[in-house]
Curated annotation (Swiss-Prot):
Name of this protein: Nucleoid-associated protein Synpcc7942_0464
Subunit (UniProt): Homodimer.
MF-aspect GO terms: DNA binding
NCBIfam families xref list: DNA_YbaB_EbfC
Cellular localisation: Cytoplasm, Nucleoid
Superkingdom classification of source: Bacteria
Pfam families xref list: YbaB_DNA_bd
Keywords tagged on the record: Cytoplasm, DNA-binding
Similarity annotation: Belongs to the YbaB/EbfC family.
InterPro entries: YbaB-like_sf, YbaB/EbfC
């Protein structure tokens, strides 16, 4: 039993060190991705731009713009236009988020990411 230590060979220690290094890279990268997403402004629109909404990359609503012509459409239609613009912005922000996360995890060799 002498000389066996804790059962970690130098190769295993290197693997462990590499795993910690990758985890640190992911953590640092995730902070940067979060900051990038917070700073993004993603536009969603409906009916050719009659209604526009902007959200951050984290899907936080930022502002909305409604063309005067849209106000003449009535409350029900206007509600549908706002919902459609929000859905458009949501889908775009989700795609941006996915793209950023894929870029973060690419090349790290982490299974399942």
């Amino acid at each position: 039993m002498a000389g066996k230590g804790f059962g970690f060979s130098l190769g295993k220690m290197k693997e462990l060190a590499d795993a910690f290094k990758k985890a640190q890279q992911v953590q640092e990268g995730a902070k940067q991705v979060q900051e990038d997403l917070n700073n993004m402004e993603i536009e969603g629109q409906a009916q050719g731009g009659l209604v526009k909404v902007w959200v951050s990359g984290n899907q936080e609503p930022l502002r909305a713009e409604i063309a005067p012509e849209a106000l003449n459409e009535g409350a029900e239609v206007l509600s549908e236009l706002v919902a459609a613009a929000m859905k458009d912005a949501y889908q775009k922000s989700t795609a941006a988020m996915k793209e950023k996360m894929e870029a973060l995890t690419a090349g790290l060799g982490i299974p399942g990411l």
